Amino acid sequence: MAPTAPAKKRKQSAEVTELSDDEIIDGLLDGALSQSEDDSDFVASGDEDEEDEDEDEDEDKDEDDEHDDKQDIGDLQDLSLNDLDDDAQSKELAKDGANGGSGDGPEADDEDRPNYRVVEDANGGIRYVYDEINPVYDSDDSDKEEDNRIGDIPLSFYEAYPHVGYTIDGKKLMRPSERRQALDSLLDSIEIPKGWTGLTDPTTGKPLNLSQDELELLKRVQMNEIPEEGYDPYPDTVEYFTGIEEKMPLSAAPEPKRRFIPSKHEAKRVMKLVRAIREGRIQPYKSKEEREKEEEGKEEKYYDVWQDEQPRDPHVMHIPAPKLAPPGYDMSYNPPPEYLPTKAEREEWEKMDPEDREKEYLPQKFDALRKVPGYETFVKERFERCLDLYLAPRVRKNRLNIDPASLLPKLPRPEELKPFPTVCQAIFRGHEGRVRSSAIDPTGLWLATGGDDGYVRIWLINPARQVWAVKLSSDEAVNAVRWRPTKDTMILAAAAGEEIFLMVPPDIDPEVEQTSRAVLDAGFGHAAGGADKQTTDGKAPAAKWARPGARLEDEGVLVKVTVRSPVKVISWHRRGDHFCTVSPSGQRSSVAVHTLSKHLSQIPFRKLSGLAQVAHFHPSRPLFFVATQRTIRCYDLQRLELVKVVQPGARWISSFDIHPGGDNLIVGSYDRRLLWHDLDLSTRPYKTMRFHPQAIRAVKYHRGGLPLFADASDDGSLQIFHGKVVSDLMENATIVPLKSLKGHRVVDSLGVMDVDWHPSEPWCISAGADGTCRLWM
């Protein structure tokens, strides 16, 4: 289609004069490379005058071109002004534009017919509205589907509308008919068209077909051919480097002198800038705020009032004024509720005489700081302070200058208190789940452990290896294991749920094994003779003694004692004939004492003030200690009376142990405190130590004469202490923290569950929630 006349007119106004190559070089690029080192490479040093003449000629040409351009622009402006001034012509154009063409009639050619309409814009001027292009059938885009131009908006927004989006011109894209889609899908299933994929275009809702190019691409990929047509996967290599050595340079011309001397043109421009800076024509940039600040500084002058002041020493009797006390919580505009007075307190304060009031104000509460009113008595308070400073005499109080370090006790260095455990020597692995209890036998050769898997395992301490294991329960965990404290027998007591098992490991000395079995079997004859006597009162026995069964007897478990509630703690008497058990959930029967030689169980307390946690026998006297959640009670077993109540001050006692001397004990609590008690000194703790960020699970004294004790915490560490106790009642115990042993992992907020000492060496065993036991040396 040929362009119309108005289009030609616009094209003429927008045409730019074509320039030849010489004009481009001389005119457009003039100055781009002037005064540079690259142009000076091709110009001789003696031809500078000729270069200046050429530059003048180029400038004249540029001025002529600019003059011609300005003339053309002026003609266009005159033409547009004449068109706007001709009102009759504009109205006629608007009328013809509204009719859709010129006034030549149907005989006018399509080439001369304008492709626009003239309408009035919002300001009353002329606006040209061009008709939409109507491409012919042969056009490339005539068969192209209109794209949906809604962008990233989900199509779910258009589910309630008959259209699915808009074209680039803002026209609605109507949703295809469902009946037609069903018919098309039926026809496509009968005869598959070319490019059919079975998918639907989410933007238009129409079937998504492949083009011919895409089909060709898929065919090439299927035939294992190169997808892109005309691509050569093996192009000829270009030998950038050859094996021929070029000894001579391509150009041996010497470097010109101008490469090594400063440029004269740049020197001229630099000197021009230097002169401008010296004359003050070029000033550094300063912001508006800086300029205003300089102007204010010029107008105002400041003087030092104390310039001539001479420093003087303060008077001998000068006492500085006391400082005001800092404000408290009651002076806050939003104090805590406990600081606010009640209605009765407010009335009482108002009735009091102002001189009798403790405070001159009552605490008040406001929602925001902006709502706080002015302080009524502010001026009065400041006036009274001035009177106090001016009238009240001042007294200087001398403070004692004492070094705080001198108040601390002088403790020995940890290096001087060796031996004590410092490193992990061996790791005992075998339990599944937590290892809840561990114990070393009186000979110091064997280690017994019990865990959540229901197994009791016997280990050889050095070297670390397992020698025997027995499964006591499939449902309950083994909460406690303790050896009988005699060297002539090897009897181990273990608690799993409500059952207590007494066993003799088979892999020991045959004589010791025979003696141990005889001690356990002796009680069955005594129990058979006194069975009727124990049940004549009609009450149920405290515990039931029986054989555990053929399977357990073959493995070395000889006696099973069943109590009323799950057992958590087992503690032996020093002679080995009695042991006590603690069941925290047992209420009245939480503490029970068992006699091994008679197979007899007794409940010593009818009622306990609190839940029992731990119980121990005194190492040398007939005393029995029972710890509840907050107190430790000491009972005399001969006189059957309460002797002493120890008050550690802890919130929840987890464990305690008695010193071999019998006059001191240590207490561990779940509130992260380790407390040392001197029973001869007071019922209150002598020392309170906080070295763990988590709860303390177990504490233990060394039984072999070494002044050592340890605690185990849920933070996965053990703390080793030196605790020296002397027989002199005038001297207190010396407690020194020695070493923090870390090695266990914290699992489910549980770290080290139990700790025990070697009977003769400075070694300790720790049982952890990570399923391992560690030997520390």
Swiss-Prot record:
**Subcellular location, record wording:** Nucleus, Nucleolus; Nucleus, Nucleoplasm
The residues bearing each WD repeat, given as ranges, are: 430-469, 473-513, 562-604, 606-645, 648-687, 691-731, 747-777
> What is the name attached to this protein's record?
Ribosome biogenesis protein ERB1
List, alphabetically, the InterPro entries matched: BOP1/Erb1 (IPR028598), BOP1_N_dom (IPR012953), WD40/YVTN_repeat-like_dom_sf (IPR015943), WD40_repeat_dom_sf (IPR036322), WD40_rpt (IPR001680)
Q: Where is this region: Disordered?
A: 1-122
Cited Gene3D superfamilies: YVTN repeat-like/Quinoprotein amine dehydrogenase
Biological role: Component of the NOP7 complex, which is required for maturation of the 25S and 5.8S ribosomal RNAs and formation of the 60S ribosome.
**Subunit architecture:** Component of the NOP7 complex, composed of ERB1, NOP7 and YTM1. The complex is held together by ERB1, which interacts with NOP7 via its N-terminal domain and with YTM1 via a high-affinity interaction between the seven-bladed beta-propeller domains of the 2 proteins. The NOP7 complex associates with the 66S pre-ribosome.
Q: What SUPFAM superfamilies does UniProt report for this protein, alphabetically?
A: WD40 repeat-like
